[in-house]
């Protein structure tokens, strides 16, 4: 429960993963049944056997394994779907019924995710144009307004109706040639008399057909031929036939005219029709009503549609996507069953339902969906906040949606209908800005695919305010009070007026005319934006960066909750699943680092804790018990904190003392100066767990072997292997060490032996090993402690099944120069220098500050919220208080934030007897001293406690150097990228810079020895070994030779000439 203000109502924030749960439950309860009901009865060619499924009695079996085991064994956490099936013999009139296994359906776990092949995956919501009809206007090539009505089908296909200057109505199917509306209606089965009886403007319909047109609509056959000729773009004179009708029915009327359940509802509402909702196809009546509306638009009646309004969008949730895939799997199963029945009859076998049905179509369909579909993504588990935010994303991208390159600015922009539904702040940066959003805290997906948001209904009859959820199409008809002090206070005088929202406009009206009011200031923000204190004082662009950067924060080894927060930290931590919660009341009878044993209601349960588990971003997930033996607990109490939670609250960073002042230029351009205390006291130390794996295969020469006897490798590299050839638990490993020893057999010819091997065979008769060493070695930057080793084989027990060995290595990373840190207001920076404590600037009580920021980073960025947080954090630290402040507190009175901060600083100054905490001449600022000289700085500066995060962009993952490595085959230049041990590219601008400094020899080295001059590279190697001067490179580098060859392929001959230094005569040389 949250309570906002003294007179506000109480309400509960919905679970942050509720949208995912509701979607999956809707699929299990309704989607499966709907698709199974549509499965057809299958007959053989002689119509003697009939197969059918009885979908209403389907069963889902509880999985045999636990979630944790599915992750470790890299298998799918799924449930088997069983459906009764019947096989009916028409000749004997008897039926054989059996329960058949249709396949496995991946289940959703408590995080709102699915585990597929051991990987947590999540399906995000997609926003699509809702099916129905939309009216718009545009200019033709003559600059004259043209009105069009666009009919969008359920799968996204478009057909257009347009009216020209002569008031003739044309239909354009899939942007191909246009045909008369009368031809389309006749082809759909309406006669001219029926058309004229069902329209409001029959004289307009009669005015434009000439004799030729009247002949085309004289009969249904002529209309179908004309329509087919235009639709299929065929020449000549096609002849009417049943096959032509079937083709048209299949290609156009079934595919492009299916409106679906939502489209039928939208069409009825827009055109004032009363067609039954189960009639989901486009009818002639729809087309004629749409044409009537179009004529009305031409004469200034009716309103145009705003395509970007959320009432014209629909959410394609996890339920819709899973149902679509289930329907696709059943179509594949139908083809398999049909083929199997025909095969059994042909070979005179007696089929049974279990013989006919295979589980492969359903299982493979879902595995390919979760693995390949753009809306199925690997769950981002950097920290607990990231997990819950990922499930609440909404995307315009994906199949049937937009692309980042084609989406217009208008679609990306904030729309008034987003209020309380889609967060106006939290979106991705870059090419997808505005296309990937985040649902607001209170938003939910309704039954018709619309996003709903709650309001309090103000009623004169009842003093109790009722909370109602409204879709985007409904809240336009109400006066909604804006969230200021007037609207949020009861007992207002009737004559007072205040701001309100009505039909996307802002008005000032009397309180008695208000219908609805907001329930909470957070209502229109996402979770990420709602965790920013004093967000109302920040520029929206910086708030956007902060929302994104909080999701990149690394869980620290010693977590700490923020002094200044917004009150949502507890709910975010709870819904993330990072903490262990008591599911019943009872008494703790045993606790240690691995499990907690709880006794209650006469039985005892053991609750296992997460121990050093790796996330897919290589951060650590670990639970620390917070209860002691003998303690009595109630249901819902915290048993253990997660990696980034403290006391059940989200704790992503640390409260550190900061000062805003320049320091010798080390914090210019967003750089950050930090104290060595943060390093030595493990303030910003984090653990990272990396996974390395290797498989053994059976080759044509025999099986690969895991062994610790590896020839031609130094014993030092094998020092950590046990007798099986696998690294020992607890070993400290460095770069290049062997983690798993593996030999691959190969055939060796006599000529491929080394000379010493041939000598041993000839003199002593010793058989030299023909196996090739293919060990798993620790790559660069992977040093650490081995914390887990898993050796397993895929199920089946065959020798051909590969063995899989996984080694988990933990790294302890202290903060260092090059790491990225950020606050909660978009204030980010790279650590530029780590100063000794005695050199840092210190406060008047002798305390050195921990971080020094550049004050120039505040005014131009307009993120002043960090000033309020910084000063209030200092007061809270001195008073031992934690603050949870709702944003937009200026709605109570002007300058409310500043008054709160100054009053708390004044109280802290009085209680601690430190007058420097609040000095009236420059409140919030203080004079501080230079740690190197002891002299005070010239100006007082802002000091305080800020909550700073360490982000996942760490220098250990990015820094890279190359001494030797692989070269590209074509250009002979070093490869690109850190993963391939690539080189640093010297491009045009870098060459110009070197030219500008006149460093000719360095430039020549860059472009020849260090790059693609093959002969010069070899000479450098030889000269380095034997000693001596390195000769100048002669001839052209390989990339120039490549250019010459490409020009020759275009019949352009190119040679180069070398001018001799001695006689300046030109010696012609072939490239």
UniProtKB/Swiss-Prot annotation:
One of its GO terms (cellular component) is chloroplast. One of its GO terms (biological process) is DNA-templated transcription. It comes from Nymphaea alba (White water-lily). Belongs to the RNA polymerase beta chain family. PANTHER family: DNA-DIRECTED RNA POLYMERASE I SUBUNIT 2. One of its GO terms (molecular function) is DNA binding. In plastids the minimal PEP RNA polymerase catalytic core is composed of four subunits: alpha, beta, beta', and beta''. When a (nuclear-encoded) sigma factor is associated with the core the holoenzyme is formed, which can initiate transcription. Its main location: plastid. It catalyses: RNA(n) + a ribonucleoside 5'-triphosphate = RNA(n+1) + diphosphate. DNA-dependent RNA polymerase catalyzes the transcription of DNA into RNA using the four ribonucleoside triphosphates as substrates. This is DNA-directed RNA polymerase subunit beta. Disulfide bonds: none annotated. Its EC number is 2.7.7.6. Keywords: Chloroplast, DNA-directed RNA polymerase, Nucleotidyltransferase, Plastid, Transcription, Transferase. The gene is rpoB. It is found in: Plastid, Chloroplast. Pfam families: RNA_pol_Rpb2_2 (PF04561), RNA_pol_Rpb2_3 (PF04565), RNA_pol_Rpb2_6 (PF00562), RNA_pol_Rpb2_7 (PF04560). InterPro entries: DNA-dir_RNA_pol_bsu_ext_1_sf, DNA-dir_RNA_pol_su2, DNA-dir_RNAP_su2_dom, DNA-dir_RNAP_su2_hyb_sf, RNA_pol_bsu_bac, RNA_pol_bsu_CS, RNA_pol_Rpb2_2, RNA_pol_Rpb2_2_sf.
